[in-house]
Regions:
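Structural preference for solvent-exposed beta-strand-turn elements
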Residues: 1-328
Length: 328
C-alpha cells in the first residue's frame, strides 16, 4: 500500500489536538495513589500512555474506559486506595517503549514493600536509568539495573526525605524523586539544574499533596493523602506545534487550535514562531488539574531566520524537529 502526500499551498481551519501524553501519565499514576475513583477525560491514546495503564493494572489498580479514544466523551476511571496500596505483581511488568512509565513508576514503587521488575522493548532497554536509581537509593530503596540499563529491579522500602541536587535538567528525574517523596518521611526537595516541565508538581497539588516551589527548588511533604479528582487532559501542545508551524510557514494560512495546553514550560515554540515573524495569538480560557488551557491562533507572515540558544533547548525538546523543518 502506498500513499501520495501533496504539499498544500495553504492551510486553514480549527483543530483540537489529542490529550497531552506527559499529563496523562501523571494523572493516571496519582489517581492510582488517591483514595477513591478519579475520572480522567481525554486521556491520551498513545501507546506509551497505555503502557502506564497496563502497568497500574498489573499492580492491582482498577481502570475502566468510557467511549472511544480521541473522540468526544472519552474518559477513563481509575480507582485507588491511597498511598502504599499497590500490590505486588505476578511477574515482571513490560513498559513497552515508555521511558516515562519506567522512570516515574520507579519513584512510585520505591515506597512499596515488595520487589518488582520493570522491563521494556529493545530500545527502552538501552536507555539510562542510573540518573533515577541514584536519588531513589539515597532515599532508602534498593534498585538494580545491569550497567544502569533496564530491566530495573526495585525493592521498595521505608523512605526518608532528602535534599537532592539534580546533576541533569530532567523532568523525569525530578518527577521520580517527588513521587517517591510522597511515600517518604519528612520533606523531599529537588534542586533543578535548569527549568524543566512542571506537570508533576501541578498534578500533585491538584490531587491534594503539599508541594512547594522556591527559586528552582521543589519540595513535597511525605504522607499527605491524595484525593480523587475529575479532570480533563488538555490538548497536546507538542502535537499542536506541527500545524502551528505549518500555518506560520505556508502563505495565507490561518489555523486555530482549541483546547490546547498552555503550560508555560511547553509553549516556548510559540515564542520561536513569534521571533521568526509569525502572527501568534494565545488566549488562556481556564485551568484544570493545575494546567492552563485555551486557544492558539497562528497566521502566516514573511518569516526570518533566527537563532535558538542552548538554554532554550530543554523547553523545545519535542518541537525541535518541526522547527528544523521550518528553518529549511
Amino acid at each position: 500500500m502506498s500513499q501520495t502526500i501533496r504539499r498544500p499551498s495553504r492551510i486553514e481551519g480549527v483543530i483540537v489536538p489529542p490529550g497531552d501524553k506527559s499529563i496523562s501519565h501523571r494523572y493516571a499514576m496519582l489517581a492510582a495513589l488517591a483514595n477513591g475513583t478519579s475520572t480522567i477525560a481525554d486521556y491520551s491514546s498513545g501507546i506509551d500512555c497505555q503502557s502506564t495503564l497496563s502497568c497500574l493494572e498489573a499492580l492491582g489498580v482498577i481502570i475502566s474506559a468510557t467511549g472511544e479514544p480521541d473522540r468526544p466523551g472519552y474518559s477513563i476511571s481509575v480507582t485507588g486506595h491511597g498511598l502504599g496500596s499497590l500490590h505486588a505483581p505476578d511477574g515482571p511488568i513490560n513498559t513497552g517503549n515508555s521511558g516515562t512509565t519506567m522512570r516515574l513508576m520507579a519513584g512510585v514503587l520505591s515506597g512499596h514493600p515488595f520487589e518488582v521488575v520493570l522491563t521494556g522493548d529493545h530500545s527502552l532497554r538501552r536507555r539510562p536509568m542510573q540518573r533515577v536509581i541514584n536519588p531513589l537509593e539515597q532515599m532508602g530503596a534498593r534498585l538494580d539495573a545491569e550497567d544502569g540499563h533496564p530491566p530495573l529491579t526495585i525493592r521498595g522500602n521505608k523512605l526518608i526525605g532528602i535534599d537532592y541536587v539534580s546533576p541533569v535538567a530532567s523532568a523525569q528525574v525530578k518527577s521520580a524523586v517527588l513521587l517517591a517523596g510522597l511515600h517518604a518521611t519528612g520533606i523531599t526537595r529537588v534542586h533543578e539544574a535548569a527549568p524543566t516541565r512542571d506537570h508533576t508538581e501541578r498534578a500533585l497539588s491538584a490531587f491534594g499533596a503539599e508541594v512547594s516551589h522556591t527559586d528552582g527548588v521543589f519540595g513535597i511533604t511525605g504522607g499527605s493523602p491524595l484525593h480523587p479528582i475529575d479532570v480533563a487532559v488538555p490538548g497536546d501542545p507538542s502535537s499542536a506545534a506541527f500545524l502551528a508551524t505549518a500555518a506560520a510557514a505556508l502563505p495565507d494560512s490561518d489555523v486555530t487550535i482549541d483546547g490546547v495546553g498552555l503550560n508555560p514550560t511547553r509553549t516556548a515554540y510559540l515564542d520561536i514562531l513569534r521571533r521568526a515573524g509569525a502572527d501568534v495569538e494565545v488566549s488562556v480560557e481556564g485551568v484544570g488539574g493545575g494546567e492552563p488551557y485555551g486557544t492558539i491562533r497562528v497566521r502566516s507572515r514573511t518569516l526570518a531566520h533566527i537563532a535558538i540558544t542552548a538554554v532554550e533547548v530543554p523547553s523545545l525538546i519535542d518541537e525541535l524537529p518541526v522547527l528544523g523543518a521550518l528553518a529549511a
